[in-house]
């Protein structure tokens, strides 16, 4: 039988060599201690373990800013992102995704198919002082990249709207803004007066792209003085948050935006539809019964981006964007040029659930990039000299 090899230790006693087990090792076994040579009593070279140094705690290292940023990004979840929007006078929306006037009725029509309480806000169908039957048919037609509509503000009148819908609106978490239209300053003022103080009405959006009968049919929206006049008149009769909707059918939106802001508006919405026509089959006449219609949908997005870009730099009140939003990148584009919120319009006809889905996708996008608030995405495409656009409304002081 072959004799087992013995190792002479420093104490001179023979010991059996330790066996290493495959697949199971400690740190000491994985890295053997260095052996110092020594001559034994027989003159043969043996080895002894080097003197072990006492273990000391490794000092904590300072994390680099980049590492800290990565760790912060990992900690943010979509539910942690602040999505609230302050439009002034106490109007704080739960998130920046609203639905546009004329595409969502009065909200109740979509209650069975859309989680209404998850929307940032609802701009209801245009409301006038008296009932309107609307324009002659045809009223709507599809176009490449959008649609033309000429509904003509069909609605039952402000009193009927309040009676039929306000009680329901008052039970919703989502704020409802009543879109108001008129043919004279008096019309706008009287509708606003009747809406003031009504439970369920969170604010007013003025549609000033209407012909001013007292000024020969000139639209309020295309003249700075007329736009300021109607805005100031409404401001005097209500403390409700007041948004004013801009028309893209002008050469320069900036003086009009400034005039409206100076007249007391709390926020701007942009844009209303572009004016256009379609030709009927056979080409014997225009297709729409009223000849002219409003163009909306993806085709108007570049125009809307331009108007928002200019308005956001011209005023110090929030801008809410509208025009061609069909997916999250559209929302991000409008935020980048200075919008603090967006309204989804024409796309709702194809997919009523789109606005709620955009709320989730925007929160996920913010969390993915480590943003604690969606407002970190606002104004990133504006020139540096313009400064940061307004992301908060004016505080109301009665």
Question: What residue ranges belong to the model's regions?
Answer:
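N-terminal capping/small domains of soluble enzymes
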Residues: 2-44, 48, 53, 58-176, ...
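Acidic-and-aromatic substrate-binding clefts and catalytic sites of carbohydrate-active enzymes
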Residues: 105-106, 186, 350
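Short gly/pro/ser/thr-enriched loop/turn and capping motifs at secondary-structure boundaries
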Residues: 128-133, 211-213, 275-278, 349-351
